[in-house]
């Protein structure tokens, strides 16, 4: 927060950091639990930074000291595949409903704990649109058109009900006339270099 303010930023909107069992389900604040070697550590941070623009990313890693378990690799692969699939799918002129209908389909074991939206707008804050899953469309969805020069944050969370851990990932993407540009460059690897 201090660095953001010193550089002309305004406020922190989200600051979730959790490890091990506190990563599942998502949205748990950090605690006094000491991070252990081999724990997943996940964070989600949004801030209104210099010039009044929002930055919103999430990452999850395995803490050094132990190799990732097969479960951790599976969770990470699911979350990463979902993000990649949905980013590859989006294009200008696509409706919100088309994205919802064609978006990555999580297996049933992940649906109860999934993140609330496939993607949401980013500009001066986390904002319109909030693109819901096809299963939630009748209750929460609304249609619109994804336009060129729109920034969307694509979200994913993979954590099983009753599972030990979960992985949260998020990328900001500029939708252009000719495609898209991922705006954040921080590694999405399970074990960052």
At which residue positions do the language-model features occur?
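Active-site neighborhoods and metal-handling regions in enzymes and metal-associated proteins
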Residues: 1-193
């Amino acid at each position: 927060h201090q660095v953001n303010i010193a550089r002309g930023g305004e406020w922190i909107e989200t600051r979730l950091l959790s490890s091990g069992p506190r990563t599942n389900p998502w949205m748990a604040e950090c605690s006094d639990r000491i991070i252990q070697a081999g724990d997943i550590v996940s964070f989600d941070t949004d801030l209104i930074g210099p010039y009044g623009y929002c930055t919103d990313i999430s990452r999850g890693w395995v803490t050094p000291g132990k190799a990732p378990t097969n479960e951790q690799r599976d969770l990470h692969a699911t979350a990463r595949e979902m993000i990649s699939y949905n980013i590859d799918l989006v294009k200008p002129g696509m409706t919100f409903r088309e994205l919802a209908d064609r978006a990555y389909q999580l297996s049933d074991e992940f649906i109860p704990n999934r993140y609330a939206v496939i993607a949401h707008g980013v500009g001066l804050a986390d904002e319109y649109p909030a693109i819901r899953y096809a299963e939630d469309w009748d209750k929460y969805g609304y249609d619109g058109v994804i336009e060129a020069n729109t920034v969307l944050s694509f979200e994913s969370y993979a954590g099983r009900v009753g599972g030990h851990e979960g992985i949260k990932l998020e990328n900001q993407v500029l939708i252009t006339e000719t495609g898209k540009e991922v705006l954040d460059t921080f590694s999405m690897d399970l074990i960052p270099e």
